């Protein structure tokens, strides 16, 4: 599936899953989980914002690494979040999970993916993904970033196989690939 269809795929899946019984306007929130580096992240976030800003407010969740390496100021300007959560908010998970209607992971890493599918949920982002799946919230994940290490795809067939298996597992848990 071409990654250029990211936004339209999310919209179609969200519309289908949420249906027409959801509250309209500013009552709905999207948590965007930022996880590691991604050269296309700002473009992806701009597309997400332009498609969802009329119906949703945005909440940002940063992984430990992302909070230190991405341009948070630029991301905040793009999404205009009403809340921003970081690793320190791990202990507020029970309250955080109530604040959003759906989760979008535009740049999940293989580390986080592996943690969630192996039930090793020891970080804020792995916990928020796990809790969203556990409570049957819509979870949309772009797997492009987890297929790369230091911006390069592997030629090792077994590593590709292991990554594909983890992607299949999280999809079986309820996530939707975008």
Q: Where does each model-flagged region fall?
A:
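A cross-family phosphate/adenosyl-ligand binding-site feature
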Residues: 1-124, 129-178
């Amino acid at each position: 599936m071409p990654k250029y269809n990211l936004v339209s795929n999310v919209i179609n899946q969200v519309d289908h899953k949420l249906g027409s019984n959801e509250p309209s306007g500013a009552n709905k929130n999207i948590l965007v989980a930022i996880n590691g580096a991604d050269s296309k992240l700002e473009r992806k976030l701009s597309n997400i914002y332009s498609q969802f800003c009329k119906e949703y407010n945005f909440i940002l969740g940063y992984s430990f690494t992302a909070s230190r390496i991405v341009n948070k100021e630029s991301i905040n300007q793009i999404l205009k979040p009403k809340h921003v959560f970081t690793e320190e908010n791990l202990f507020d998970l029970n309250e955080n999970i109530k604040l959003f209607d759906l989760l979008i992971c535009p740049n999940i890493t293989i580390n986080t993916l592996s943690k969630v599918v192996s039930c090793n949920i020891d970080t804020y982002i792995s916990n928020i993904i796990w809790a969203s799946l556990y409570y049957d919230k819509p979870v949309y994940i772009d797997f492009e970033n987890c297929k790369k290490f230091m911006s390069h795809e592997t030629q090792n067939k077994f590593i590709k196989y292991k990554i594909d298996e983890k992607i299949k597992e999280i999809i079986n848990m309820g996530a939707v690939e975008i």
